[in-house]
Amino acid sequence: MSLFRRNEIWYASYSLPGGKRIKESLGTKDKRQAQELHDKRKAELWRVEKLGDLPDVTFEEACLRWLEEKADKKSLDSDKSRIEFWLEHFEGIRLKDISEAKIYSAVSRMHNRKTKEIWKQKVQAAIRKGKELPVYEPKPVSTQTKAKHLAMIKAILRAAERDWKWLEKAPVIKIPAVRNKRVRWLEKEEAKRLIDECPEPLKSVVKFALATGLRKSNIINLEWQQIDMQRRVAWVNPEESKSNRAIGVALNDTACKVLRDQIGKHHKWVFVHTKAAKRADGTSTPAVRKMRIDSKTSWLSACRRAGIEDFRFHDLRHTWASWLIQSGVPLSVLQEMGGWESIEMVRRYAHLAPNHLTEHARKIDDIFGDNVPNMSHSEIMEDIKKA
């Protein structure tokens, strides 16, 4: 077992009983403390190997090892965010002392952390301006959020039991079933209202999303080197796509027009701010700067002004897909255009294009034998208005 330093932090390198070589952070810059932790870990491993003891590991040590082993995971930032929640409840607690009851108790008290962060910012602003402090009103989280946090701690504790041999038996954690919500999409008139209410550069981003179906992160992180205007194609790199494979995006006239309007604003990023903005501390941002993926203020304000409720940015992708399906695009083609990994992920839009079932449904007409006129949608609506 040896010690080495990386970026001022001390690490230990050692071999497991099975021969596997492991490197782990000791979480300290102090060499003496690192040596003490090293010796403790060495003695612990000896007891595990020779006596069959389980190591006395805390929850944060398990979290640290998880993050180190999953360093290349695309959704690592999401893992960190969920781990941060669990550390609020189990920091300093030994793994063997974490029970199902304690886990469920923590989840039952979950509140939206973003709401609390916004409240804290408002408190600081009120203090600076000498105004009355706002009251904190906790916002409950969805079943889906609870399910994702439970899945996170379940994965860590399962790894502690099966892979790291730090637990004799991990708690049995049941993940609540999450119902698939309806596909939320906009009518063309609603989309036009939303676009009209969006300030730049959000307006261009929304247009591009509706024209291509790309996810927000792919649009905000889009670079000029990923675009070939002559061939009318854009590329999403494998490390940036949800399916972990490269995606070619066909650029229609609308998308090309949006891109041409961005030329000359930045040498690298396609979509950027061009006007300075005030920060919470009163300072100003640079005029030309990359857009933030997590910024929602302008989006929510535009939706409110347009009279559109319960609509997320990702629903623009649903809108794009819904429009294509209603225009007669086959599911298999939509899957390729949207870069979905399986056809099952596209079937959520199938109900929007039931026209291919019409001929089969007409078999019932043959059974009744009635002479039923084949009326168009406009004719039917006209008759309804007359009634």
Curated annotation (Swiss-Prot):
The active site is at 215, 242, 314, 317, 340, 349 (o-(3'-phospho-dna)-tyrosine intermediate). One of its GO terms (molecular function) is site-specific recombinase activity. One of its GO terms (cellular component) is cytosol. Keywords: DNA integration, DNA recombination, DNA-binding, Viral genome integration, Virus entry into host cell. One of its GO terms (biological process) is symbiont entry into host cell. The keyword Acetylation does not apply. Residues 57-161 form the Core-binding (CB) domain. Residues 181-362 form the Tyr recombinase domain. InterPro entries: CB, DNA_brk_join_enz, Integrase-like_cat_sf, Integrase_catalytic, Integrase_recombinase_N, Tyrosine_recombinase_XerCD. PROSITE patterns: CB, TYR_RECOMBINASE. It holds the Pfam family Phage_integrase. It comes from the Bacteria. Integrase from the cryptic lambdoid prophage DLP12. Integrase is necessary for integration of the phage into the host genome by site-specific recombination. In conjunction with excisionase, integrase is also necessary for excision of the prophage from the host genome. Encoded by the cryptic lambdoid prophage DLP12. Belongs to the 'phage' integrase family. This is Prophage integrase IntD. It comes from Escherichia coli (strain K12). The gene is intD.
